[in-house]
């Protein structure tokens, strides 16, 4: 499920970032206890009136000293048009209509994308003359004060009325996102799998751009490689590409069942690779690490692959549960093996263990190690059951779940994995009070 994108655009110093923070604050921010899953410096996931959407703050894209201001603003708006489902064009009600505002309106009007004009810094609608913005030919102006929150509720009502409905997809096919840093060989890998002449595309309405899904059938299973438009096409705009790539990556992850993270073997595992891997893992998606350009890896021996994986696991321990595949997209070496791994990971991700089996496993683990006491009192774990799939989630019930330390949760996690594997799939452990 890929959420709509709402981009905040406008001149510098009109309060875009303040509005972003206000809206994220007024809306129900969808947060997680796990770091890095919902909030970024420039975009956040929000919910209003039961509707979810991404809100994007483009403020950081303009303050580039080497660019002329009008050029920077125009590029900012053009990027938003390419990426977003709805633009919020923010103007300064205290300054009034600025010459750049009229030029931005012309761009937005020609874009054929929905947009709304938001007059910021309207602390008191009765005393602020924001009506002059109707001179720009708009039918509605939404007065707000990012400072004190006035008008933000009406604005959010209008936002959710103007973004496309998101319908839960019936996923008969396994949806696969190929993600990773630029220039690691993602497009070559997909083309090698599918073949250019076999690339079947379908335009999806209501997306941020013309996203392309590439379907194929393998061993009687339908696979769909999602968001391949971003893999095959370079952005028409150079500035701010990294800014939007994180959002594109997150949307591709949200639309997928299994993520293939491409790594450049010649560059090794970079911090950005780890951030992307964690983004997919914490989102509950299946994960496969494909080490591309393995044919170019220097001083390779028969132990190089094991060494590469060992170093990766030392950096991020959960990667020991993730399958690695060492390939060359250019030569085709081992590329098609990923299809069997995708099917296996999705099977693990949708696997359901009977309650009796889960309790047998819990009993064995308790026989090996009891949870530590809390404040001199015994902590008991009574029973466990699997409550979810995609990803597998096991609830463990006891008399004082809040007192169980993190290291014991890891012990349970590792013990369950020893028994069932769940290779490539996140495994979540939930602690609950008995009879809750």
UniProtKB/Swiss-Prot annotation:
Protein name: GTPase Der
EngA-type G domain span: 4-167, 174-350
Binding site for GTP 2: 180-187, 227-231, 292-295
HAMAP family: GTPase_Der
Superkingdom to which the source organism belongs: Bacteria
PANTHER family given in the database record: GTPASE DER
Gene assigned in the entry: der
Organism: Gemmatimonas aurantiaca (strain DSM 14586 / JCM 11422 / NBRC 100505 / T-27)
Family: Belongs to the TRAFAC class TrmE-Era-EngA-EngB-Septin-like GTPase superfamily. EngA (Der) GTPase family.
């Amino acid at each position: 499920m890929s959420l709509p994108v709402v981009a905040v655009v406008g001149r510098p110093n009109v309060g875009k970032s303040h509005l972003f923070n206000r809206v994220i604050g007024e809306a129900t921010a969808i947060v997680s206890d796990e770091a890095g899953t919902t909030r970024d410096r420039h975009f956040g996931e929000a919910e209003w009136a039961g509707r979810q959407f991404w809100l994007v703050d483009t403020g950081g894209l303009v303050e580039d000293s080497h660019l002329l201001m009008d050029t920077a603003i125009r590029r900012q708006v053009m990027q938003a048009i390419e990426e977003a489902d709805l633009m919020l064009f923010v103007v300064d009600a205290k300054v009034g209509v600025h010459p750049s505002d009229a030029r931005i309106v012309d761009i937005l009007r020609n874009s054929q994308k929905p947009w709304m004009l938001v007059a910021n810094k309207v602390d008191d609608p009765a005393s602020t003359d924001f009506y002059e913005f109707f001179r720009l030919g708009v039918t509605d102006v939404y007065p707000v004060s990012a400072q004190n929150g006035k008008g933000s509720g009406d604005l959010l009502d209008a936002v959710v009325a103007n973004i496309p409905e998101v319908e839960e997809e019936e996923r008969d096919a396994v949806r696969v996102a190929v993600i990773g840093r630029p220039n690691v060989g993602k497009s070559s890998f997909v083309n090698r799998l599918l073949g250019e002449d076999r690339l079947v595309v379908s335009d999806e309405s209501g997306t941020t751009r013309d996203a392309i899904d590439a379907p194929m059938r393998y061993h009687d299973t339908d696979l769909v490689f999602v968001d391949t438009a971003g893999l095959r096409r370079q952005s028409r705009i150079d500035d701010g590409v990294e800014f939007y790539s994180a959002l594109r990556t997150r949307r591709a992850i949200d639309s997928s069942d299994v993520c293939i993270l491409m790594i450049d073997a010649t560059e090794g595992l970079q911090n950005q690779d780890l951030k992307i891997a964690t983004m997919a893992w914490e989102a509950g998606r299946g994960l496969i690490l494909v080490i591309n350009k393995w044919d170019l890896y220097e001083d390779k021996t028969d132990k190089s692959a094991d060494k590469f994986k060992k170093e990766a696991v030392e950096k991020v321990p959960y990667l020991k549960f993730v399958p690695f595949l060492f390939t060359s997209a250019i030569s085709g070496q081992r590329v098609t093996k990923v299809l069997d791994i995708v099917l296996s990971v999705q099977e693990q991700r949708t696997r359901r263990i009977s309650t009796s089996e889960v309790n047998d496993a819990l009993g064995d683990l308790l026989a090996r190690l009891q949870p530590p006491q809390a404040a001199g009192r015994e902590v008991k774990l009574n029973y466990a059951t699997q409550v979810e799939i995609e990803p597998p989630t096991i609830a463990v019930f006891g008399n004082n779940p809040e007192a169980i330390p993190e290291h014991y949760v890891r012990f349970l996690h590792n013990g369950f994995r020893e028994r069932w594997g769940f290779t490539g799939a996140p495994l979540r452990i939930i602690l609950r009070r008995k009879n809750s």
